[in-house]
């Protein structure tokens, strides 16, 4: 079996899709069933899996400003959308006996043996959670991927059912390959976490934690409103720590963040390096994730793997991931979310049960299983 794997999602900052791509390709590279693995980036082959580095210098900042400018040019974006898949197809013209896997929705133009991973279809079902330019771009490109793919992988049974329902896609051509988290996410002692806690000026089990992109789909505004309902004494004892890449703008959200920061019960850490995250999770009192829509919900799996109680929403894929280990609520019910957060902070009996159940639930997910399921899916072609 010969595979070409697209590596574009493996870049800083490493999103959930980037993490999936990185963990999967590392294991495909050593899988016995894979006779040959080629890495494809942009429209050319590369020799090594990309390194994820913090691009915080001025050169990277200039690059980011250039990309932001280009994204505001609809004609350039449309030209890229039309031409780039054809450039890729031309570069792949002599590799018809390979299976091509695009792990982030997109595929080159008209390949004979193409697999794509659809992580969710919120661009179609909940377009209000995305910038309009992203919706315009992805709607067209994802329809083309659906037409081109001989097989679709997806990361949850929820996402699989959504694709079948919305697009009437053949069920035998969609395979669920559930995600996992890094082996770095394990329970840790206060001493192990101390360097990271000191770095961010935090206390062991002295905070509630949210990790994820700061964007409307994640319902962070609802989370802040729910947290604001807690007694001020509780909020000051357990401040809400927010960490994640700043997504598309939500002015009301940032006004709430700034207000909570002034009052002393919110801190926004920005994008935290990967090497710090397992310790930031493991030292938290509780993890909160009341998202409106998820294709999987990797952060709650990471939290459970660290032995941290979880409060999350009861919609889309999240119940599938959390099982009976966490407290779940309607993401629109701020009062219920607030009550669950309070219980997760103060109810020691429930916390002990939630920790044990979370660790057991997390063991059901592994990158080895994901890789095996992916390779078995390749065999269907």
UniProtKB/Swiss-Prot annotation:
The keyword Coiled coil does not apply. Pfam families: Glycos_transf_1 (PF00534). Its EC number is 2.4.1.349. GO terms for biological process: O antigen biosynthetic process. Keywords: Glycosyltransferase, Lipopolysaccharide biosynthesis, Transferase. The keyword Glycoprotein does not apply. Disulfide bonds: none annotated. It comes from Escherichia coli. Belongs to the glycosyltransferase group 1 family. Glycosyltransferase 4 subfamily. SUPFAM superfamilies: UDP-Glycosyltransferase/glycogen phosphorylase. This is O-antigen chain mannosyltransferase B. It comes from the Bacteria. Mannosyltransferase involved in the biosynthesis of the repeat unit of the lipopolysaccharide (LPS) O-antigen region. Catalyzes the transfer of two alpha-(1->3)-linked mannose residues to the product of the WbdC enzyme during the synthesis of the adapter region. Pathway: Bacterial outer membrane biogenesis; LPS O-antigen biosynthesis. It catalyses: alpha-D-mannosyl-(1->3)-N-acetyl-alpha-D-glucosaminyl-di-trans,octa-cis-undecaprenyl diphosphate + 2 GDP-alpha-D-mannose = alpha-D-mannosyl-(1->3)-alpha-D-mannosyl-(1->3)-alpha-D-mannosyl-(1->3)-N-acetyl-alpha-D-glucosaminyl-di-trans,octa-cis-undecaprenyl diphosphate + 2 GDP + 2 H(+). One of its GO terms (molecular function) is glycosyltransferase activity. It is an enzyme of class 2 (transferase).
């Amino acid at each position: 079996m010969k595979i070409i794997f697209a590596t574009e999602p493996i870049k800083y900052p490493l999103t959930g899709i980037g993490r999936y791509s990185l963990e999967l390709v590392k294991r495909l590279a050593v899988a016995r069933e894979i006779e040959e693995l080629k890495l494809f980036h942009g429209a050319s082959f590369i020799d090594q899996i990309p390194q994820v580095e913090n691009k915080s210098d001025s050169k990277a900042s200039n690059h980011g400003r250039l990309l932001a400018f280009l994204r505001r040019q609809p004609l350039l974006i449309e030209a890229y959308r039309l031409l780039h898949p054809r450039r890729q197809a031309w570069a792949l013209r002599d590799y018809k006996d390979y299976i091509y896997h695009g792990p982030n929705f997109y595929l080159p133009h008209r390949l004979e043996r193409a697999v794509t991973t659809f992580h969710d279809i919120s661009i179609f079902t909940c377009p209000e959670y995305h910038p309009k330019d992203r919706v315009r771009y992805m709607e067209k490109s994802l329809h083309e991927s659906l037409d081109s793919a001989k097989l679709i992988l997806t990361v949850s049974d929820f996402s699989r059912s959504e694709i079948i329902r919305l697009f009437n896609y053949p069920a035998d051509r969609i395979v669920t390959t559930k995600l996992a988290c890094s082996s770095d996410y394990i329970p840790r002692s206060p001493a192990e976490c101390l360097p990271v806690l000191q770095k961010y000026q935090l206390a062991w089990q002295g905070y509630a934690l949210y990790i994820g992109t700061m964007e409307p789909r994640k319902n962070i505004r609802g989370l802040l409103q729910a947290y604001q309902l807690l007694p001020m004494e509780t909020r000051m004892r357990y401040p809400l720590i927010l960490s994640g890449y700043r997504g598309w703008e939500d002015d009301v959200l940032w006004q709430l963040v700034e207000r909570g920061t002034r009052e002393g019960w919110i801190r926004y850490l920005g994008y935290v390096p990967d090497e710090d995250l397992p310790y930031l999770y493991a030292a938290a009192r509780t993890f909160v994730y009341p998202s409106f829509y998820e294709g999987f919900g990797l952060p709650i799996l990471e939290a459970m793997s660290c032995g941290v109680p979880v409060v999350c929403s009861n919609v889309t894929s999240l119940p599938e991931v959390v099982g009976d280990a966490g407290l779940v609520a309607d993401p629109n019910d701020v009062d219920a979310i607030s009550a669950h957060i309070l219980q997760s902070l103060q109810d020691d009996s429930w916390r002990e049960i939630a920790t044990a159940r979370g660790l057991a639930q997390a063991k059901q997910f592994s990158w080895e299983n994901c890789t095996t399921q992916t390779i078995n899916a390749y065999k269907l072609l």
